[in-house]
Amino acid sequence: MASFFKIAVICLVMLVVCSNARVIDVDDDYLMDFAASKRGGQTCYCRGGSGPTGGFWGGQNCPAGMTSCRKNILGNCCQKSKEGTDCDI
């Protein structure tokens, strides 16, 4: 009976810990910056020194007349050129 009680307590503790994502506080900003630099999101720019219109994540589309300048998942939206892309990667 005592071992059953111990197992029940362990299961209850694990349930509480696993259901609360903030039990272990994580520095989300640091992780996002680290992931962005690893995926090349910070090194993808528009040609001609023109700034990008903003970053996007993989599932999003760029506005009309623009193309995605990206490496892997992160990137920027730049003006479309005659060649079809206006990105410096």
UniProtKB/Swiss-Prot annotation:
Tissues/organs with expression: Expressed in ectodermal gland cells.
> Which keywords label this protein?
Disulfide bond, Signal, Toxin
Named from the GO MF annotations, one term is:
toxin activity
Instruction: Report if keyword Cytoplasm is assigned.
Output: no
Q: Which domain of life is it from?
A: Eukaryota
- Extent of the signal sequence: 1-21
Q: Does the keyword Cell membrane apply?
A: no
Give all cystine bridges in this chain.
44-77, 46-69, 62-78
What role does it play?
Probable toxin.
Q: What is the official name of this protein in its record? A: N.vectensis toxin 7
Q: Which organism is it from?
A: Nematostella vectensis (Starlet sea anemone)
